[in-house]
Structures are given as C-alpha cells and as structure tokens.
Amino acid sequence: MQSSPPNTQHPSPNTIELLAPAKNRECGMAAIDHGADAVYIGASRFGARQSAGNSVEDIGKLCEYAHRYGATVHVTINTIIYNDEFEDTLALVRELVAVGVDAFLLQDMGLMSKVREIVPDTVALHASTQCDTRTWEKAEWLSQQGFDRVVLARELSAEEINGIHSRLPELELEAFVHLSLIHI
C-alpha cells in the first residue's frame, strides 16, 4: 500500500535541501535515517544510474519509507532516449508515479513535454545535470519549458551559482557539493 506523499509544496528560495544519491533501496533508507531530506535513485532503465538495477517495486518501497519520514524520492531518467524506447520510457514513468515517486530528473526535452502531460502536478520535474546548465538564460529557458528545478552543471563555482540565483531567485536550483564522487 502506498503511503501518503509528503508536503509537496516547493521549499522557499532560502531553504537548503540535503539530497543524497542512493545506489539502491537500502542505501536510500540509510541516507534518510542519517538526515537526508531527499534521495535520488535510478530505475533499471533509462537513467544514468540504471546499472544499479533497481526495480519499480524496490523504488516503491523506498518511497513508502521516505514518505513515512517526510523525505522525498527523485528518479533519474536522464539518458538519451531513442525513438524505439520512447513508449517504454513513458510506461516506466507511469509505473513510478503509481508507486509514489516525487520527482523525475530528465534531460530529454521531448520526453519532458510528454512526461508533464501524464504526471500529476504534485510530481516535480527537474532538469538533470546532463542538461549542462551554466547560465541564467538556460536555467530560465528550462523553467519556461516546465521544469520545477534546474540541476546546475557540476563544474560551476559558488560565485557562478550565486549569479544564476540572483537573476532567478524564485527558481529552485540544485548544485552538487561533492561532485559525483560520493556514493552512499
């Protein structure tokens, strides 16, 4: 049985969210136990974290656990999607929504437009770091396309991140603190 989703209101622009990578359900639960506000995880296909092989069922169990403790679960669907994979990708998105996923990290603009049509407004869409966002203009454009949050390029300095934030104070921005080298 799916638990109730956490408060889906977006954090204030001054709120910092601790978002941790989760190789699998157990790692995600451990991150939540140690204070993570949210975790991101890959499904078995279509994401940069697909090698972990997490089933929809496992992600659903992680969602139940996370929601019990007021945390959220974000799923990466951020690889290049080919024509022959498009419908399977949308089917996976529907399955993940059904088990309680709170957000998707996407990089394919065509996929994003279709995902926005099929998921409820309570499910957030985040522009993945694979979008390589380095300017406020690109971040603004991604927001205009329907993304709720933009994950900035990993190489940006704190000064560059602040510059984007100062131009777009209402847009949720996400930045890697320890790059992609730290895995729980």
Regions found by a protein language model. Give the residues of each.
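Acidic (Asp/Glu)-rich catalytic clusters
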Residues: I32-D33, G60-G70, V97-A98, R116-P120, ...
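Conserved, mostly hydrophobic/aromatic
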Residues: A31, D108, L142, A175
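Glycine-rich, proline-tolerant flexible connector loops at the mouths of alpha/beta enzymes
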Residues: Y40-D58, I77-D84
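Short, well-ordered coil/turn segments that N-cap beta-strands
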Residues: N14-I16, D37, H67-V73, V101-D102, ...
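N-terminal basic/disordered segments at the start of proteins
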Residues: E17-A38
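Active-site-adjacent beta->alpha loops and helix N-cap segments on the catalytic face
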Residues: Q50-G60, Q107-V119, E155-P169
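Conserved small/polar residues in nucleotide/adenosyl-binding loops
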Residues: I182-I184
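Hydrophobic faces of well-ordered beta-strands that scaffold small-molecule active sites
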Residues: L18-P21, V39-I41, V73-I77, F104-L106, ...
